[in-house]
A protein has these predicted regions:
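Carbohydrate-binding surfaces of carbohydrate-active enzymes
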Residues: 1-115
């Protein structure tokens, strides 16, 4: 992703991935900090004119990639893997009304194969 763009379509695709990852990591961080933070207000939910921007929905009401990053992490139960500086950690946030049983499968993926 961090290479030179190969044209307009490639640029749009990679900017979409960046928006998705930005929203996903932001929401996962907020879910992990649930004791200290209980809400979030989005500044740019939608675009007010056709443009490339940091909103979640475009001018025509079509969801952008960031919308799907939000949708995935706004589920009642959300699991994420993060680096706390000492190693990788798994955090599970349960915002449902009760207890839930869960199973997690973790795979380490290289660019060319699963390790």
């Amino acid at each position: 992703m961090f290479v030179k763009f190969r044209g307009a379509n490639d640029r749009m695709y990679k900017l979409g991935i960046m928006g998705y990852e930005w929203m996903r990591t932001s929401m996962e961080g907020m879910r992990r900090s649930n004791d200290y933070m209980s809400g979030n207000i989005f500044w740019m939910y939608n675009d007010c004119w056709p443009a490339v921007g940091c909103s979640m929905v475009d001018y025509y009401g079509v969801p952008k990639a960031a919308y799907y990053g939000f949708k995935m992490t706004a589920q009642k139960i959300c699991a994420c893997v993060y680096d706390d500086g000492k190693g990788l950690r798994i955090a599970v946030s349960n915002n449902s009304a009760g207890d839930s049983a869960a199973e997690i499968a973790l795979h380490l993926v290289a660019s060319d194969r699963i390790l």
